[in-house]
Amino acid sequence: MARRRATPTKAPPDLDARVAELYGGPLPSFVTRRDALARELRAAGDREGAAAVKALRKPRAVAWALDAGAHADPGALDRLRAAVDGVVEAQGGAGDLRGALDELRRAEQDLVAAAVEAAAGHGRPVDRTAVGAALRAVVGNPEALADLLAVRLVDAEALPDPGLAPVAAPAAGRGRATGGR
């Protein structure tokens, strides 16, 4: 008897949102949920998307907390994005640097609070100081910042603390599940 191929179903409408849910969801089930999404994409006929999702790495705890906070409180993430943009503009001479840095500190505090709350809500409390230090390092690293803004940061602990280094604009084209990395 000939094997009948399953008819592919339609691919998820917004893969980026699904990946953000994956990174913002419970850490212990990350691999199970990632693999389920990859199977869903493969069943829908999206082999490229399935391979890209399957290749996604499980985040480390502090990076996951930042992702979870960003996913749970998109407003905090938007404020961080706006504050980073404000600092970059002010560093270029187009504004009040001190005011922009104050706004960045407030935005960082908001996202750290969201991360700590989201992690606790998932039953995985994290150290507020460690999350704050990690966020400062992320803000100073364009690739890591782009990943956080896309809610898919994997590792913040490996980043050096930038100290008083300038804030970097996020790298363009980073953080897509199916994009050309």
Give, region by region, the residue ranges found by the protein language model.
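Actinobacteria-biased recognition of intrinsically disordered, low-complexity terminal regions
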Residues: 1-25, 32, 42-43, 169-181
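Short acidic alpha-helix initiation/capping motifs at coil-to-helix transition points
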Residues: 11, 29, 56-60, 79-81
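Exposed alpha-helical structural elements
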Residues: 14-18, 48, 52, 130, ...
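A short N-terminal beta->alpha junction/helix N-cap motif
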Residues: 21-29, 53, 71
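Amphipathic alpha-helical coiled-coil/helical-stalk segments
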Residues: 23, 69-70, 75-180
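N-terminal interaction modules that seed assembly of large macromolecular complexes
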Residues: 33-75, 86-94, 118-121
